[in-house]
Amino acid sequence: MGKDKKDRKHKGGLTEDILEKNVTKPSKRVKHRRERQADSVESFVEEKLSKKILEQARQQQDELMEEYGFRKTGDRKTLKSAQTTLGTPDLDRIDDDDEDDSDDGASMTSETYYENVEVDEEEEKAFEMFMSQEAPTRRTLADVIMEKIQDKKTEIESHMSEQSTAPQMDERLVKVFKGVGEILKKYRSGKLPKAFKFIPSLTNWEEVLFITEPDEWSAAALFQATKIFVSNLNAKMAQRFFNLVLLPRIQDDIAEYKRLNYHLYMALKKALFKPAAFFKGILLPMCESGNCSLREAIIISSVLAKTTIPVLHSSAVILKIAEMNYSGANSIFLRTLFDKKYALPYRVIDAAVYHFLRFLTDKRTLPVLWHQCLLTFVQRYKEDISSEQKEALMELCRVHVHDKITPEVRRELVHSKSRDMETDQPMEST
């Protein structure tokens, strides 16, 4: 026995014995403690940051609504209490395909976004003097839809007479899109029907769109539709949507309520994401019609003033408006575009100068808007006009005089350089 005890040896070293036993490892315990501590700190930081982010977002929202006239300053407490009672949104209801359907949640608390436009009666009378007397009758959105329906009936009758084998739209699809139209009539917020989102991808999207009766949509539905069509249509198709659906609805709303609904105003801002389609589908048709009202021009120009527009598109639309027959709305739009202070090509500047010089032989009393537009142009581009053009503008100031504005125009012209003076300076000999 003693020999056995003497010969008995450890199977392994001390390290192996320790590893084989269930000994607590302090390093792991410390690690877990550190992880729990980090989790608590992270959760505390996230909660703290969340409160700061929400507070800053609420402050920015209040500032924006005060700036745009969405509500008065005294309503801040009411709005804050209303927001706290609403709670957090249900994220499960948000569809991945939606483009921020609820990003304008504050809009649901008010019916209109743009406040009443104060219009001077005398200025409005002077404005109407320059409106086209032969302007075509303005069409409402309902008129456009009825015209489309009549054209479709004529097309179907012609196909039937020619015994065409072209497939017609399935009655089940017609029923589906009519149901979509019924939903859009009562739409306020939330997700749109998925069938509606497929319309821009259809070849006959225009026909399908008018099945939903856009003239009956709510303003919120039209805003969401504008977002979808701007994102999924090319410039030419978007121009059709703006001209046939958005523009008549905006004109009807302004004519009826003397102001523009908030959602329609935001739809205009969203439409400017495609500037070429916006100008060709909304702005230029309003100028060409000759019957654009003063309120319409002021509201549309406010959208232009608050949105960044590419220089080339701005130059093109200034050139087009300058070459049109004059109406009061032209002065408002030109003044807004001049105020952006873009570096315009000389061709556009020359067209703007000749736009004003056309009134040298006009004996009518020009509205204040025209004088304001001239002053803005001279202030921004006085050094980009030639000396001959400057002399012609000085002569124009003698023909059409405004007590307060014309002296400012003269002062800007006198105390400025001309573009040809800069090029005619002799080069210094080296």
UniProtKB/Swiss-Prot annotation:
Residue ranges annotated as compositionally biased, kind Basic and acidic residues, are: 68-78
Q: Which portions of the chain have biased composition (kind: Acidic residues)?
A: 93-104
- Which terms under GO biological process does the entry name? rRNA processing
Q: Name the segments for region: Disordered.
A: 1-45, 65-113
Q: Name one GO cellular component term.
A: preribosome, small subunit precursor
- Indicate yes or no for the key word Lyase: no
Q: Where in the cell is it found?
A: Nucleus, Nucleolus
Keywords assigned: Nucleus, Ribosome biogenesis
| Chief location | nucleus
Q: Which GO terms describe its molecular function?
A: snoRNA binding
Q: Where is the composition biased (Basic residues)?
A: 1-12, 26-35
Q: Output the superkingdom of the source species.
A: Eukaryota
Task: Please verify whether the record's keywords include Nucleus.
Answer: yes
Chain's role: Required for processing of 20S pre-rRNA precursor and biogenesis of 40S ribosomal subunits.
Q: Which family does it belong to?
A: Belongs to the bystin family.
Task: Spell out the protein name for this chain.
Answer: Bystin
Species of the source:
Nematostella vectensis (Starlet sea anemone)
